[in-house]
Amino acid sequence: MAAYTATSAVGVGLGPLREALAARRSGLRRNDFGDGERLDTFIGRVAGVEESALPASLAGWDCRNNRLAWMALQADGFLDRVAAARKRHGERGVAVVVGTSTSSIGASEEAYTRLDGDGGFPADLARPIVHTPHSLGDFVQQALGLRGPAVTVATACSSSAKVFAQAARLIRSGVVEAAVVGGVDTLCGSVLFGFNALELVSSEPCRPFDVARRGLSLGEAAGFALLEREGSGPRLLGWGESSDAHHMSSPHPEGLGARLAMEGALSRAGLTPADIDYINLHGTATPKNDEIEADAIAGLFPASTWASSTKGWTGHTLGAAGIIESVIALLALEHGEVPGTLNSAELDPLCGPQLRLDNGQRRCRHVMNNSFGFGGNNASLLFGYA
């Protein structure tokens, strides 16, 4: 991992993220998003997106989602690290693989509220690229000056975890020498009211794995990482992917897909469950998701493994959850600062000894990140040092 960065409700870049995790300072706040009717809930909203602007050369991609992407790309020297990789490998030697669940749908929603007299989109939003699922991927490729493969992954909440697997396959097959991976999702009406229609949204800050959890808190975020065939730093050691095909919005009742994804990551990395020091869980604070994931963790990993959900800090950032929580796992790997589970007070009895409420310090050799999406799209990633 040549470089990585994350922007969420707790701030822009790695510094604010580490500080918020250590101080157990949540980025969640009462919903103040949008005009008119607002849901009674808490959200993880990124400050400054509305006031930010894209460079003139990228104005054609302007929308809230791409503005958040640009904010994240500028943090932690990430643009410079990609520029150096572009110089080493050439414009076509670096792929872009990004994940998103809603892309720029917020811009499409706005366009439909401001149709012109002929029923068409208003002039300022009559830009087809921002109304496609590939808006994010196309924007990131243009912003970074790259000309290699560009892929947008949209597998709901596992989107920006699955990008790591796709990028690794591109590198291992010799198609490219490096890849920029990441994910971005922003809040919009479709997200807030859609999840509320499924009765998954809590009216209080989310409490993952708590016995009295009431649902999720939605958030927005952007994050990126640079993967290279050769180099120093933490490595992607393994990944596992599975598809439940059980239900549109509920996981397999026995956690079959979740377990297969975790076992696949362990197998590809040549590791055993006892080798994993920390797992960043999907842990959305919905009743069924947490119950099934907790049972899978308890049945697969020894008591010595530490596990937690960090959605109490950022909210559930949907298609960006995979990258944001991979970055948090990478921080634990590099610095030994392992987060607990924020806002929760009493763990569900179904949780095993792996689940932790409090932060802790421990030397981590191998860390895992779980991302499980609607439709049973599951991905588990394993990071460590080669």
PLM region descriptions:
Residues 6, 56-77, 124-132, 150-162, ...:
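Active-site pocket-shaping loop/turn-to-helix segments
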Residues 1, 91, 273-275, 351-386:
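Flexible, low-complexity linker/loop segments at domain and module junctions
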Residues 1-2, 14-15, 19-32, 38-42, ...:
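Condensing-enzyme catalytic core mediating Claisen C-C bond formation in acyl metabolism
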Residues 100-151, 289-302:
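Active-site-proximal gating segment of KS-fold condensing enzymes and close homologs
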Residues 79, 133-137, 141-144, 149-183, ...:
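Active-site-proximal alpha-helical scaffold in enzymes
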Residues 10, 15-98, 104-107, 261-273:
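Conserved active-site "lid/cap" helical segment
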Residues 3, 21, 96, 140, ...:
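Conserved small-residue
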Residues 175-197, 202-213, 239-253, 281-290, ...:
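Acyl-CoA/ACP chain-elongation machinery
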